[in-house]
């Protein structure tokens, strides 16, 4: 029985909106995926833009608030209507400051566990990332449904005993999840 659904953020739970970014925002956003941790990111950003870390964070906040939104506004409610005892978690590779996005979208209030690679020091698809996810959720691996849009992440999650769904963007996420859950009941 699934007790927790762990979502990847980008490409699964969140979608990217058409938001015209400033030159500074574009520079900062493009590097989200190219560096390994907060220290490296902010060292690069402060050097590149000649701004303080606080100024960089002030530029990032509008990016979280305008560029990203929930792929499906009522996804949590739809799942909880059918499975009221399920918990939610986030498992993402990203800069720690992404927490601002989660607050803006009320995701942090809905998710019991939030695991961000740059916070914990491990990235998907590493063994350590999945071990830490399981440890923080406090359920057995087979009680966790992991959803991601990267096949390698899905494969490794399954290798560590998690149930997993490879999410494809042309489908409705809640329907994909509910269909999967109904099949394994």
Where do the model's predicted regions map?
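Alpha-helical elements of Rossmann-like donor-binding domains used by nucleotide-donor carbohydrate transfer enzymes
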Residues: 27, 40-44, 62, 74-78, ...
